[in-house]
Amino acid sequence: MNYITDSIKELKLYNAKKRESRIEKLLDYYNGNDVAGYIRKMFSASVFNEIPLTEVNITRRFINKMSRIYTIGATRNAGDKYEGLTALKSTRMKHIERMTRLCGTIATRVVWSEGETPYYDYRPVYFFHVFFDDDPFVPTAITYPILQPVEDASQVQKLHYAYWDAEKYVSMDEDGNIIAEIPHTYGVLPFVFTHRENQTDSFYVEGANDIINANEHVNIAMTEMQLGLRFQMFGQPVMTGAQLGNNQRTGSDVTLELPEGSTYDIVAPQGNVQNVIENVKFLVELVAQNNHLWVQWSEQGGEVPSGISMMIKDLERTEDYQDDLALWRMYEDDFYEVEKQIASSFGVSLPNDLGLDFMEPEYPKTVQDQILWDKHRLEMNLIDEVGLLMEYNNDLTSEQAELTIASNKQRNEKLSIFEKARQAAERTTPVQSGIAGQDNGLSR
């Protein structure tokens, strides 16, 4: 029985280490950290003396394009007090969404930053282990390595770990020795776990493995292509019928003396560069389609697409976006519950419910279409002039927008008075000119 238990523990430990390796690779590809190191083993050491390894980064662009929920942001309505506490939330949530798309599952700690003006901060954690009670999808505790100041050459201390549950925080060294144990009064685990999609048979959801796999293939193919181009340009010297050894120097400034009957030639591989390029395009387009994206290459050109054509082309991605809205609305509720509990422990009361409105990205409209759309919304009382001005200039507050509109109306009314006077003058001028002409005729 102990043998079975030990085997299960070893398997779980192995799976945890493999997951950490996958997360590290995902983060490296997104950040562009030594991406060449992942394909270096595919080539012999002598290749590195010929060309540098290709380090193309399509992962970051794909992940950023897939993350649309917080592209523009979200409007949260829970009172002025909550608005002040969450000044950083929209910016942090944009990054959290991207990292969730990349890693599959991340943990975000909700931090109460005290000071003259307290506020929430949100710190994502990528490498972590969770503990459960009865529900395998609801963690009750978490442990993770504490980030060290690795850029500080004077810091050589051991790695520290943090442990959190609903009652206490524990700091440990890498040997498991407790450094500090501090109780807290939150009454809740101060972490929110976000997943790129709904969980199936495990707490963790896999990340963007297909994207980094395609990225790896692209880097290998591009490196091979550059290596082939080098050999095609310079070729490989080949000599027959002469016993001169392999260390002969060749070049345009070198004369070789060959014995009678020997031959000297330069051969080059017959690889098709265009086929390699088409294969790279196929890989990129395939992974893009699998993630509801489409790729347009620079040489395709063509007319600038209209908003309607973009909507039709992007229909599948729009449906996927609507599915994600429901998921992230649930995560926003989870964040708010944790925020509310933490605020209560510091004597701050927040409303029971959070009003939330995700600001959806819009497709471009022509000027005429935009004018008609704005006029329709004003006539149907879907928006007022203040809200419309704030859409065009979101740096304005409602009070500033209201003052701007009142000032513009007053100025336009004055201009309209002068315009009416000018038009009246233009109407009377031809009549007066005709009378003057008749007088001149009578005098003659």
State where each predicted segment sits:
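Extended, helix-rich architectural segments
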Residues: 1-118, 435-436, 440-444
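Polar/charged side chains located within well-ordered beta-strands of beta-rich proteins
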Residues: 26, 42, 160, 169-171, ...
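Extended, regular secondary-structure scaffolds
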Residues: 101, 107-200
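Extended, charged amphipathic alpha-helical segments
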Residues: 178-312, 316, 349, 359, ...
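Generic structural signal for hydrophobic core residues of well-folded globular domains
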Residues: 30, 42, 46, 51, ...
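Short secondary-structure junctions and interdomain/linker hinges
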Residues: 18, 33, 73, 89-92, ...
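Short, charge-rich amphipathic segments
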Residues: 2-41, 149-152, 204-225, 247-273, ...
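C-terminal anchoring/interaction modules
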Residues: 2-3, 251-270, 274-288, 309-444
